[in-house]
């Protein structure tokens, strides 16, 4: 009699466990993969933002003549077999004059919902040309053009 009661209790639990374990394991793995991809995107966004800022500050000096500089940041073309895209928007602070401009950089992993944003502080003499950074492009780069009046135009190449 006791054996029958044990089977009545254990068989449904085993069947339930057989279905619940894969569902639970899938949910945990999805969370882990999304976290890992987001961390990699944050790293890429930080490096790309740093490249833009360094390019700007390198040209933003009176001793540097007007001209164009292109920099390839050496970022990986893929994050876990997916390429990513970078986009940026320039905004100025409310007060005119020598106030800084802010470049909001958004990097998105294509094929996923993962996206990160970082902000880069630049000077008041900067312009941004709308462009997209494509990680899988062979000529993915950041380009800066300094004009004779000291204005620096930045954009993504590739």
Question: Where do the model's predicted regions map?
Answer:
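Aliphatic-rich helix starts adjacent to a transmembrane/signal segment
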Residues: 5-46, 57-59
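Short, glycine/small-hydrophobic-rich surface segments
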Residues: 55-78
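Intrinsically disordered, low-complexity regions enriched in Pro/Ser/Thr/Gly and acidic residues
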Residues: 75-158
């Amino acid at each position: 009699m006791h054996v029958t009661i044990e089977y009545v209790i254990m068989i449904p639990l085993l069947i339930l466990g057989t279905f619940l374990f894969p569902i639970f394991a899938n949910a945990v793995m999805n969370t882990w993969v999304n976290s890992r991809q987001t961390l990699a995107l944050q790293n890429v966004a930080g490096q790309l933002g740093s490249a833009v800022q360094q390019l700007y500050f390198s040209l933003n000096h009176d001793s540097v003549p007007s001209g164009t500089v292109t920099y390839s940041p050496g970022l990986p073309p893929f994050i876990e077999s997916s390429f990513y895209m970078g986009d940026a928007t320039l905004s100025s602070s409310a007060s005119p004059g020598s106030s800084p401009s802010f470049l909001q950089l958004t990097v998105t992993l294509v094929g996923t919902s993962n996206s990160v944003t970082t902000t880069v502080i630049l000077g008041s003499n900067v312009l941004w040309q709308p462009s997209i950074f494509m990680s899988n492009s062979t000529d993915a780069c950041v380009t800066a053009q300094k004009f004779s009046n000291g204005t620096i135009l930045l954009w993504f190449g590739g």
